[in-house]
């Protein structure tokens, strides 16, 4: 039987006593779905996200302080994406999707650092685990997010270029036929391009692992190092390591979003004059 309780916080930064496991502790099952501690965190983040969306939908002509902060954040994301894409109009199209991902990741990466969140523990078979495990320290979360991103990119690519136009980047049969019609040499060259296109399919699938493992590996490694370092230097290090944790959480969010922005811009239909 799982028992939920709280522990008193001695520092502004929550310090765990045990090194976290790669697999999140399981709380139970709802039908075929397994509910883990990271699932609770994800649901809590979703609730925060809904509150933010409601707040934005009720924005006023004369912004209050919170609305002003959200507008500053939007402008920062817009400028960041425009610097990657190199086209302000394209950036405006990408901002809503990528901005939502960045907001989610920043909340997910920084939420476990708040002392109130870290004060809730659950006892499973005599062992104590944090009730709110960092969502991005669970590979299931990062894999699901990366898979959703890659699938969305395929849908956008088909929407922008058409089914056959988009698939022609991967299965270049027409290029092979055209190549052999021109000459044998160009035909052989087009065959090479055909196999390169097939490799691109593998590349698209690899993006799922690349995005998910990068985010999971960095955030999980940071959590493990937090336990080790704060366990050894629990007096002097917490404030310094909290700053490092904030930096790691924000940087990993930016890296993930930058890669998604690049993937998004690649599947958009090229406009006249773009190369």
Task: Cite the ranges covered by each PLM segment.
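Selective transmembrane helix interface/packing segments
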Residues: 2-275
């Amino acid at each position: 039987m799982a028992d939920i309780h709280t522990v008193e916080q001695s520092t502004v930064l929550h310090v765990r006593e045990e090194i976290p496991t790669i697999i999140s502790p399981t709380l139970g099952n709802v039908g075929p779905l397994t509910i883990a501690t990271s699932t609770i965190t994800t649901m809590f983040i979703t609730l925060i996200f809904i509150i933010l969306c409601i707040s934005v939908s009720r924005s006023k002509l004369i912004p209050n302080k919170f609305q002003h902060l959200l507008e500053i954040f939007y402008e920062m994301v817009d400028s960041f994406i425009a610097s990657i894409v190199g086209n302000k109009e394209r950036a405006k199209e990408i901002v809503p999707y990528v901005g939502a991902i960045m907001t989610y990741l920043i909340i997910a990466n920084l939420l476990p650092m708040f002392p109130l969140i870290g004060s809730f523990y659950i006892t499973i078979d005599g062992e104590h685990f944090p009730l709110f495990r960092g969502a991005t320290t669970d590979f299931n979360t990062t894999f699901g997010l990366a898979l959703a991103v890659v699938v969305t990119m395929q849908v956008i690519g088909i929407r922008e270029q058409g089914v056959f136009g988009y698939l022609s980047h991967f299965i270049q049969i027409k290029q092979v036929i055209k190549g052999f019609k021109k000459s044998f040499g160009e035909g052989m060259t087009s065959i090479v391009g055909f196999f390169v296109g097939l490799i691109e399919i593998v590349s698209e699938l690899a993006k799922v692992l690349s995005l998910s493992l990068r985010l999971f590996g960095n955030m999980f490694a940071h959590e493990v190092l937090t336990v080790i370092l704060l366990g050894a230097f629990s007096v002097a290090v917490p404030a310094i390591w909290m700053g490092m944790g904030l930096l790691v959480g924000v940087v990993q969010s930016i890296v993930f979003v930058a890669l998604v922005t690049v993937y998004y811009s690649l599947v958009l239909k090229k406009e006249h004059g773009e190369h």
